[in-house]
């Protein structure tokens, strides 16, 4: 299945600034509008990566968003402001079709057959780190980064997923990623606790909660 990536839905591109030690390796940073993904992007900028922020539109932002939901119109604005603070480009990409076919439809099908599906796992596997990687390829990005609390370890047989902060561990949400996906994944918050993330947000001038 082919997907069309719609660049920038109504938001200006912010030019990135780097220091003399910037390594210049391009990274697509998934930005939900929350503090975790914003800090993850900020830490990568500090390390010298060429960071491109991306927020994924999973459904029409005119529809009412429930508490704790992602990708509402306010999330787009929060992500845009965080990207502007960090001095990086920001795009909103239309993944509504991919989300519906790979997450919603699968959830309904599994539920009808008596299974207990986890839509977050499917979303990360097929959309955030599946389809998003295609966008990374398109713009010449080597890695995709997220704000998950999980770690990656280098073993003799390749990359392995490991638990992050026990209180906030989110490695389960990435458990179905294939080795080739893990090899191109960056998890800047893997060794941090939530309080440390918030401290980094304050230091970076990020105002998201």
Model-derived features: positions:
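Aromatic (phenylalanine/tyrosine) cluster motif
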Residues: 3-5, 11
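ATP-dependent adenylation/nucleotidyltransferase module used to activate substrates
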Residues: 11-176, 186, 194-203
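A short, charged helix-loop
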Residues: 180-184
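Mid-to-C-terminal catalytic subdomains of enzymes
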Residues: 205-209
């Amino acid at each position: 299945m082919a997907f069309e990536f719609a660049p920038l839905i109504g938001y200006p591109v912010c030019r990135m600034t780097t220091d003399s030690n910037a390594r210049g390796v391009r990274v697509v940073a998934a930005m939900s509008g929350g503090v975790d993904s914003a800090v993850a992007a900020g830490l990568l900028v500090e390390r010298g990566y060429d960071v491109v922020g991306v927020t994924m539109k999973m459904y029409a932002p005119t529809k009412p968003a429930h508490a704790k939901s992602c990708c509402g119109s306010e999330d787009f604005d929060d992500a845009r402001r965080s990207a502007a603070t960090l001095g990086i480009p920001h795009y909103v990409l239309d993944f509504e079709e991919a989300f519906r076919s790979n997450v919603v439809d699968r959830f309904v099908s599994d539920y009808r057959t008596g299974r207990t599906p986890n839509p977050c796992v499917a979303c990360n596997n097929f959309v955030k780190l599946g389809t998003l990687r295609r966008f990374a390829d398109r713009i010449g990005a080597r890695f995709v980064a997220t704000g998950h609390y999980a770690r990656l370890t280098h073993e003799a047989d390749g990359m392995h997923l490991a638990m992050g902060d026990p209180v906030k561990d989110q490695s389960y949400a990435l458990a179905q990623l294939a080795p080739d996906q893990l090899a191109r994944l960056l998890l800047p918050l893997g060794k941090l606790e939530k309080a440390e993330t918030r401290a980094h947000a304050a230091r970076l001038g990020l105002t998201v909660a």
